[in-house]
Amino acid sequence: GFSDYKINLGGALICGYTGVGPDAIVNRSAVKSSVRGEEVALDVLAAAQPKKLYILLGTNTLTTVGAADRFLAYYGQMLDVLRQTLGEDCVIYVESIPPVRPEAAAEKPGLASDIIRSVNEQLALLAADKGCVYLDLWETLADGEGNLKEVLAAPDGVHFSAGNGYGAWVTYLRNHAKYSADNSWTMGSIYSAQ
C-alpha cells in the first residue's frame, strides 16, 4: 500500500506484505515485499531497531469464520517476540483491524462487522497486557453501520483506496502518535513543530 502508492511517511521503514498474519512473524517465515523482495520480516525489524512500530495485519487472516482464536493466539506471541527483539524502548502501536464493505463481508464471512469488532476488543486487551498502544481505526474508517466508508474503499471492498483511504489512515496515525521531539513520523500531525 504505502510503498505502492508513493505515500510520504517521513522516511519510515515500511514492511508491507500481502496476506501476512502474525504467524508469519512468529515462525520467521519468508514473506515478499514489493520494494525489497523476499525477506524475513522479523530480521528486517531487528536490523532497523525502530523506536516506534505500527502494526496493521489480520484482515486477510480472518476471511474464514473460526480463524479468530488462532489469529489472536499468534498475535499475542508476535507481540512478545517483537518486544524481545526490539526492546522495551520501542513503542509498539497495535492498530485495530479495519472494517470492510458489506459486499466484501458477504463473500468472506469471517470479516463480518461483529466478528471484526470482537477481535478488535481482544486486540485492545492484548495491547494493554503487553504494554503496547492500541489505535482504534474504526472512528475514522467506519460509517454509521460499522462498514468501511465507501469513499475510502478500494474496489475489492477490503483494502483502502489509493487516495482517500490511505490518506485517512495516515492522517489518523499522525494525529494519534505519542508525541516525541525526535519522531519525524509525526510530521504534519497537530503536534509537529513545522
Spans of features found by a protein language model:
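A generic secondary-structure signal
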Residues: 43-44, 77, 81-85, 172
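Active-site segments of SGNH/GDSL-like serine hydrolases
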Residues: 54-62, 81-118, 138-139
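Charged helix-capping and loop-helix junction motifs
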Residues: 68-78, 116-119
